């Protein structure tokens, strides 16, 4: 009986370790983008390809922060938002450093290339009161960011199932496009009032906005396209299976 118990115990342990080795998949919930974008909901998936290599993909919805008007300018008054939407997609290829890690992927130190795309837009309603125009104006603000870079991170695995993923450092090159549209025929001076307003909102709500966006060009034209420094920092909590 004792021998049978020992044999069964060894079988269960061997099966448990075998299941652990077979866990090549992890699903994630991203907690980082909520700091920058409102109502962000992003899920991810990581697949082990080789003992020290994996591929991840992330997809979800994002939105620009809600605009708030704190100025005392009676000429342009924000009435409220009328809609917002956004989309996130990113992917990366990870090399888990076998010389630095005790375990195989997806545990330990990793580095590798990544690509990320974010698009968000927000519509707002305004009241404009000038000597030549009085009435309601609708605007739409859109922001798109393409980023390519190299990331460095560390992933913990707790209780064989829970994954804590930290992309600690992710410098890259970003292509930023921001555009504002107005649905009413206004003079150039009147349009600039809105462009300046929208620009100040974005600078207030989005960290690092003023470092990559040409505010002068946007204030004059209502749009700007620039290539500048990009960055990725990410925290995921996942489940392995």
Please give the residue ranges for each predicted region.
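Bacterial Sec-dependent N-terminal signal peptides
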Residues: 1-23, 237-241
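Outer-membrane beta-barrel "beta-signal"
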Residues: 90, 94, 227-241
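Short loop/turn motifs that connect adjacent beta-strands in outer-membrane beta-barrel proteins
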Residues: 19-24, 51-52, 98-108, 158-164
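Transmembrane beta-strand segments that form the barrel wall of outer-membrane beta-barrel proteins
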Residues: 21-41, 54-63
């Amino acid at each position: 009986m004792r021998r049978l118990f020992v044999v069964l115990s060894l079988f269960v342990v061997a099966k448990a370790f075998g299941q652990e080795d077979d866990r090549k998949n992890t699903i994630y919930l991203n907690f980082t983008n909520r700091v920058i974008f409102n109502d962000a909901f992003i899920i991810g998936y990581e697949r082990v390809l080789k003992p020290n290599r994996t591929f991840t993909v992330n997809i979800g919805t994002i939105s620009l922060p809600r605009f708030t008007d704190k100025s005392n300018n009676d000429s342009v008054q924000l009435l409220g938002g009328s809609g917002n939407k956004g989309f996130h997609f990113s992917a990366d290829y990870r090399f888990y450093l076998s010389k630095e890690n005790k375990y195989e992927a997806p545990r330990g130190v990793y580095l590798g290339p990544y690509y990320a795309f974010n698009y968000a837009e927000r519509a707002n309603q305004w009241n404009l009161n000038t000597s030549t125009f009085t009435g309601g104006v609708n605007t739409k603000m859109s922001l798109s960011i393409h980023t390519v870079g190299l990331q460095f991170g560390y992933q913990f695995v707790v209780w064989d199932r829970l994954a804590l993923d930290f992309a600690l450092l992710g410098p890259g090159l970003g292509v930023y496009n921001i555009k504002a549209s107005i649905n009413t025929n206004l003079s150039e001076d009147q349009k600039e009032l809105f462009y300046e307003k929208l620009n100040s909102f974005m600078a207030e709500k989005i960290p690092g906005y003023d470092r990559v966006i040409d505010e002068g060009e946007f204030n004059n034209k209502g749009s700007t396209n620039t290539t500048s420094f990009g960055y990725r920092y990410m925290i995921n909590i996942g489940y392995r299976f």
